[in-house]
Amino acid sequence: FTEVTDLLIEDKLCQDAIHFHYERPTMGAKMGIQSDGYGGSPSEDQNLLTIFVIDYSFSEEVEIINKDELIRTLKKGANFINQIDSSLFRNSLEETSEEFIYTNDLYRQIDLINSYEIIFLTNKSERARIKEHDIKARNENCRILVIDINQIEKLKNGQNIPKEMIIDLEKDGNSIPVLTASVNNDYKSYLTVLNGDFLAKIYEDYGHRL
């Protein structure tokens, strides 16, 4: 965990990484819960709550993680976020455990948090493509970042990982009006004008990830 997250922090893919493990398996229709750490205080990261989930394989061969496995684990991470403001869940945790301490710390900040991110760490190879709207926590779309064995090797070799970002403009009733500037066989170009308040709101929500 520490080796990989140190690389993520260095590459500015996350602000911080604090490790703890909590997992409750899925039972029938009752969604499981999983968290293997979080990205530090949301108040220090544009009110973004980042949760880490891990899927580690002990196989000597590199395994392929399929989309169903990936989504199932991500949803368990999202369910951990959903449970933070549940007194029933918090009271079920051992008071001396790390998960109790960190969950209560996050609960005290829950009203300040305005966005969520789940970072999936695995030594398997990921080939599925997950859109952000596939995973929700507290009725908000989660940003998803999958760091598989291939991405880890790139980080170790000093290669930057481009982080795809989807900005949901409709959530706040916004849009970007554009005018066609030119069209040719290779590409189309457009012109737009954005006001300062709009740009400030995007920066407030997405910060250094832009």
Label every PLM stretch briefly.
Residues 1-210:
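N-terminal extension/subdomain marker
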